[in-house]
Amino acid sequence: MAKVKVAAVQMSCSRDPIGNLRKAEQLVRDAAAEGAELILLPELFERQYFCQERQYGYYRFAKSVEENEAVRRLTMVSEELSVVLPVSIYERDCTTLYNTVVMLDCGKNLGIYRKTHIPDDHFYQEKFYFTPGNTGFKVFDTSCGKVGIGICWDQWFPETARCLALLGADIILYPTAIGSEPILGGDSAGHWQRTMQGHAAANIVPVAAANRTGLEKVLPCEENAYQESTLNFYGSSFLTDETGKILSGAERDTEEIIFAEYDFALLRETRLEWGMFRDRRPEMYRRIVE
C-alpha cells in the first residue's frame, strides 16, 4: 500500500465565523496542494473558543449536521480535492447539543463522533454547552485507511486511544483547542504533547493533534454575568510515528500546516509483531470501569 500523507492545520480563530471558514478552506486547499490526503483542522474552528464564558445566547451557534455551514462547504471541498476531512462542529440534535466531528471522505459523510469527555473549569466551561457524547468511540473506514477520532479533552484519557486501537485505527486524530491556564502558573504544552506521545507508543499507532493558536479574551458584561477570562492558545500541533516520536511539529504562535507520511499496511504488521494486543488480559482490568 502506498504511503498516506497526513496534514495537521494550525490556525487562529476570530469572532467572524465566515472569515474563519474561508481561512480553514484555504488552509485545506494549501495542504492538498502539498499532497495531503488526510487533513485535520482544529476543534470548533468556526468561532473563537466561546466556552471560556457562559452565555445562553451562544446555544444558537449549534446547528444540525445538515444545516452547519462548515459541513456544507467543506463537503464540496472534500469532494473537489479527493481528501479525507474531519470537521469539528457545535451540533444540535433536536434538543441536545454536542461537540461533534463529521467525517468527510471525498465528499461523502461517513458519520459522526460526539466528544466523550467534557471538561468543566473556569477556562473550559464545556459542560454548560455540550452533552457527553453517545456515539461511543469511532473508527472510520476511509479511502486513506482506518481513522480514529478523539476530541481535545478525550486526548488526555488513555482509554480513548486504547479503545480506538482495539477498533483497528491506523491513526488517531485529535482536533484540539487548548492554551495556557494562568492558574497553573505556566502552560501545559509539554505535558499535552507527552500524553499523546505515550498513547502512540503504548498502542503502536501514530497520533496527530491540530490546535488553534492566538490570544482570546472574554470581557465582563451583563450577558455573561461579568465573567472575565483569557486563554493563550499555544499551538504546538504535531504528528508522531507509532513509537510516539514527533515527526513534525508546529510553532506556538504561527498559523501553519505540518505534514507526515505513513505506511499503514506496514504499521499493521508492526503492531502484530509487538504482540501488544495478543498479550492483553482484559479480565484483569475490571478496576478501570468501576
Name each region found by the language model.
Residues 6, 103-110, 240-247:
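Short, glycine-anchored, charge-dense loop/turn motifs used at functional sites
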Residues 53-61, 121, 222-228:
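Short glycine/proline- and charge-enriched loop/turn segments
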Residues 267-290:
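A conserved C-terminal secondary-structure "cap"
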Residues 1-38, 173:
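N-terminal active-site segment of His-dependent metallophosphoesterases
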Residues 17, 26-112, 178-205, 215:
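Cys-nucleophile CN-hydrolase/nitrilase-fold catalytic domain and related Cys-dependent amidase chemistry
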Residues 87-89, 100-103, 138, 237-239, ...:
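Short beta-strand scaffold segments in enzyme catalytic cores
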Residues 66-84, 152-256:
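CN hydrolase (nitrilase-like) catalytic-core segments centered on the catalytic cysteine
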Residues 63-66, 76, 92-198, 272-276:
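Active-site catalytic loop in hydrolytic enzyme cores
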